[in-house]
């Protein structure tokens, strides 16, 4: 290895001082920060507030200081159907309810993976990966689908938010600590020669402790509840006592198995028009993990537009922090000129595939597509997005995505499989999925707070 010499430093300093633009950039950046100094005013003006195709949603939701964006996005697609079916002004499903069961199922998933890797070295990559974040808040559509098929949904009034659902950090920290100690006990007991049957008895007791911790933090999830909905004209639209599973079946009108995950990963190890899954990624054991069909970006746009034109919102996952004006709610590759600020390629140094390969980008956040604009030739130009950061964020709680930003940073959408071509549908339903490593970027979990 070669160290940095003082001659190297002197040369770098001379290079900096040789261009007045560097000094101007330094003065702006040290005062305002990188993103504000790189902000392009025209980036805001390029994003109008009207849309050619648009679905109308209820009041904006707020995940607060939790990583439940994937749950909020999923529930926002559900509540849209409820609002439309019963002619409601607005409505909200409980986000604390699926959080409870997700933590319960992830804990079980983690301990099952520990039992399945007893012969793996503790300091090996696989076990180290499993121990890194056993029950984080993040997730994907297939994981949410598994939760709903097993546990249903409830109105927010049936299981309201708590301090720990609004801010999951402390609960997650203590549950993670407990699960890591449980993993230690299971591995050490196995090393001592105990049978798998004995280990499973230990795990059963551990899961009772997990349940106790979750009820303490989130409250008891309802087994049944009364629900009454009034429409915009104050007429009683729904009244009765339901289980969570009955409430989903009665109000949402959605076959969960019809909605599938489409990804767009242009890396060499993932040829397009094939199916993929991720090893050891999931939550509900009987849910079967995740399954994707990998298509090119133009196909993701075609599918999303088709569903929006049928007046249905679209769940999607993206790398939200890239080229993002958070206060204005604008995601646009023209919004920030970081390369111009520094005078060399930074944001433009890697293409979409290279960013995935070199760890620069992956899916970090899930939201909902609510609308789209087209140019004179029918090409998409701008997308309306329902976020879950409250009404004071962005433009009254919604964001916009430029079409070039979609090209670069949208990685996953969820659509009704009826919009696929016959060839695409056959591939998704019949092809044996290629198994990706647990740490593959397509296994990232939408979790941004």
Predicted regions and their residues:
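Catalytic nucleophile-His microenvironment captured as a short glycine-rich beta-strand/loop
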Residues: 69, 148, 357-390
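Short, glycine-/Ser/Thr-/acidic-enriched flexible segments
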Residues: 76, 321-323, 372-374, 390, ...
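Conserved catalytic-core surface of thiol
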Residues: 375-449
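Long, positively charged binding patches that form subdomain-scale interaction surfaces
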Residues: 289-364
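Active-site nucleophile-adjacent alpha helix/oxyanion-hole segment immediately C-terminal to the catalytic cysteine
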Residues: 44-314, 393-396, 403, 411
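Generic recognition of flexible, low-complexity loop/linker segments
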Residues: 290-292, 300-306, 354-359, 368-375, ...
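Short His-Asn-centered micro-motif
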Residues: 72, 316-319, 370
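N-terminal regions that are enriched for targeting/export leaders
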Residues: 2-58
């Amino acid at each position: 290895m070669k160290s940095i010499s003082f001659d190297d430093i002197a040369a770098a300093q001379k290079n900096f001082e040789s261009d007045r633009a560097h000094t101007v950039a330094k003065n702006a950046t040290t005062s305002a920060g990188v993103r504000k100094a790189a902000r392009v005013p025209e980036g805001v003006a390029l994003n109008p507030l009207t849309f050619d195709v648009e679905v109308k949603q209820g009041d904006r939701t707020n995940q607060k200081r939790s990583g439940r964006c994937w749950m909020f996005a999923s529930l926002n697609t559900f509540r849209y159907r409820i609002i439309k079916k019963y002619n409601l002004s607005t409505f909200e499903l409980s986000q604390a309810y699926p959080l409870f069961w997700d933590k319960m199922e992830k804990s079980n998933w983690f301990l099952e993976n520990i039992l399945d890797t007893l012969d793996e070295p503790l300091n090996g990559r696989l076990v180290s990966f499993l121990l890194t974040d056993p029950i984080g808040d993040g997730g994907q559509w297939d994981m949410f689908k598994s939760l709903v098929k097993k546990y249903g949904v409830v109105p927010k009034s049936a299981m309201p938010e708590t301090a720990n659902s609004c801010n999951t950090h402390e609960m997650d920290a203590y549950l993670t600590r407990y699960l890591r100690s449980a993993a230690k006990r299971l591995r050490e007991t196995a090393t001592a020669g105990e049978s798998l049957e004995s280990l499973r008895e230990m795990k059963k007791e551990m899961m009772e402790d997990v349940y106790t911790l979750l009820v303490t933090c989130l409250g008891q999830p309802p087994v049944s509840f009364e629900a009454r909905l009034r429409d915009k004209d104050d007429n009683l639209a729904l009244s009765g006592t339901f289980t969570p599973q009955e409430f989903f079946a009665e109000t949402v009108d959605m076959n969960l198995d019809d909605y599938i995950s489409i990804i767009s990963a242009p890396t060499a190890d993932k040829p397009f028009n094939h199916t993929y899954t991720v090893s050891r990624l999931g939550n509900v054991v009987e849910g079967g993990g995740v399954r994707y069909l990998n298509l090119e970006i133009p196909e993701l746009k075609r599918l999303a537009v088709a569903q929006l034109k049928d007046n249905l919102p679209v769940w999607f996952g993206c790398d939200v922090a890239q080229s993002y004006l958070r206060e204005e709610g604008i995601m646009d590759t023209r919004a920030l000129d970081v390369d111009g600020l520094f005078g060399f390629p930074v944001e433009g140094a890697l293409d979409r595939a290279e960013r995935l390969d070199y760890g620069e980008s992956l899916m970090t956040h899930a939201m909902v597509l609510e609308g789209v604009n087209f140019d004179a030739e029918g090409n998409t130009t701008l997308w309306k997005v329902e976020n879950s950061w409250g009404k004071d964020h962005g433009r009254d709680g919604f964001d916009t995505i430029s079409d070039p930003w979609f090209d670069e940073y949208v990685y996953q959408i969820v659509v009704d499989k009826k919009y696929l071509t016959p060839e695409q549908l056959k591939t998704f339903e019949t092809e044996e999925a290629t198994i990706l490593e647990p740490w593959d970027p397509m296994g990232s979990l939408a979790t941004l707070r």
